[in-house]
């Protein structure tokens, strides 16, 4: 089965992230434009600030837009999918055209269980709903910026995720098929990991928000401070670590047999590991009391 357009998109973006990392830190470390396009938030605060490059920046709080878009798109797809499953009403033709484009040049559906596909979409729905809530009511964003490249990439992920997942199914004859014994084990393990990672990520974001709030919940500062407690005792970036676990859980549910889900999972893995390494290095340089045994993203490993 050929690599689909949807999967190819995320493979290319994964390679682009790796390429940019080496360009910024090894090949052209003094080219400000590359650094401004690649680095985000506190990682770029001490660099030069040519006003012309502000054109490529957006507020970091715009991360909220990712999850708002994800809620709208994913909820819409779940509603349309429910109509297909319950009432046998096919997806609207424009939506089918999007699916066909993302799955091209393939025409034969993947052999992934329909039940597993639905579970992945439900997991993504829970993820974007929770993250949207956290961005609006938990997180306290600094006044730092991200590049428009990161912003567009984030929008693209949450715009295409659900469609990429559904594109490889037989969406005209979608069925909630059963799963075999191994499939059931994968569903149970994947769902357990998903809820565990989601809970730990929520705890992590509360720890980060408390660094900028008083005991009464009033925002006191927007500084970057050294977090402690929870998974921060083991890694510098537990929010990135748990994000990796969440998309790993989705791939476990589909038994690593869904091309697009795997491609997106690899993109998340590579992107979060690179961002974690840079953030870890920033903490070590800026805090003398930084714990020596704390890793970047994977406890006890990296």
Regions picked out by a protein language model, each given a short descriptive name:
Residues 10, 63-73, 120-127, 150, ...:
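Hydrophobic alpha-helical transmembrane segments of polytopic
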Residues 1-26, 157, 176-302:
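Hydrophobic transmembrane alpha-helices
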Residues 86, 139-143, 170-174, 209-213, ...:
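Transmembrane helix-loop junctions in multipass membrane proteins, especially transporters and channels
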Residues 59-62, 80-163, 167-168:
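Intramembrane catalytic core of multi-pass membrane enzymes that act on lipidic substrates
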Residues 1-104:
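N-terminal signal-anchor/initial transmembrane insertion module
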Residues 15-30, 72-89, 124-139, 157-171, ...:
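Membrane-embedded alpha-helices of multi-pass membrane proteins, especially ion channels
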Residues 51-54, 58, 108-118, 141, ...:
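Juxtamembrane loop-transmembrane helix junctions in multi-pass integral membrane proteins
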Residues 28-66, 129-151, 210-218, 224-234, ...:
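Helix-loop boundary elements of multi-pass alpha-helical membrane proteins
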């Amino acid at each position: 089965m050929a690599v689909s357009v949807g999967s190819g998109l995320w493979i290319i973006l994964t390679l682009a992230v790796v390429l940019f990392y080496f360009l910024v830190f090894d090949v052209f470390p003094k080219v400000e434009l590359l650094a401004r396009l690649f680095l985000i938030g506190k990682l770029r605060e001490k660099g030069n600030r040519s006003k012309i490059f502000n054109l490529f920046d957006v507020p970091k709080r715009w991360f909220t837009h990712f999850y708002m878009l994800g809620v709208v798109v994913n909820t819409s797809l779940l509603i349309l999918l429910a109509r297909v499953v319950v009432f046998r009403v096919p997806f609207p033709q424009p939506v089918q055209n999007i699916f066909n484009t993302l799955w091209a040049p393939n025409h034969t559906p993947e052999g992934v269980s329909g039940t597993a596909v639905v579970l992945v979409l439900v997991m993504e729905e829970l993820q974007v709903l929770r993250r949207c809530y956290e961005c609006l009511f938990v997180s306290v964003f600094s006044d730092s910026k991200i590049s428009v490249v990161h912003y567009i990439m984030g929008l693209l992920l949450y715009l295409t995720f659900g469609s990429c997942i559904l594109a490889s199914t037989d969406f005209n004859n979608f069925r909630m098929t059963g799963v075999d014994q191994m499939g059931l084990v994968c569903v149970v393990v994947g769902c357990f990991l998903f809820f565990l990672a989601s809970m730990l990520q929520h705890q992590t974001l509360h720890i980060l928000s408390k660094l900028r709030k008083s005991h009464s919940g009033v925002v006191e500062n927007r500084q970057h401070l050294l977090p402690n407690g929870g998974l921060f005792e083991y890694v510098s970036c537990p929010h990135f670590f748990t994000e990796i676990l969440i998309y790993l859980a989705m791939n476990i549910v589909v038994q690593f047999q869904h091309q697009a889900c795997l491609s997106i999972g690899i993109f998340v893995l590579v992107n979060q590991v690179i961002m974690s390494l840079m953030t870890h290095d920033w903490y070590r340089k800026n805090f003398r009391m930084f714990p020596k045994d704390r890793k970047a993203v994977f406890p006890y490993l990296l």
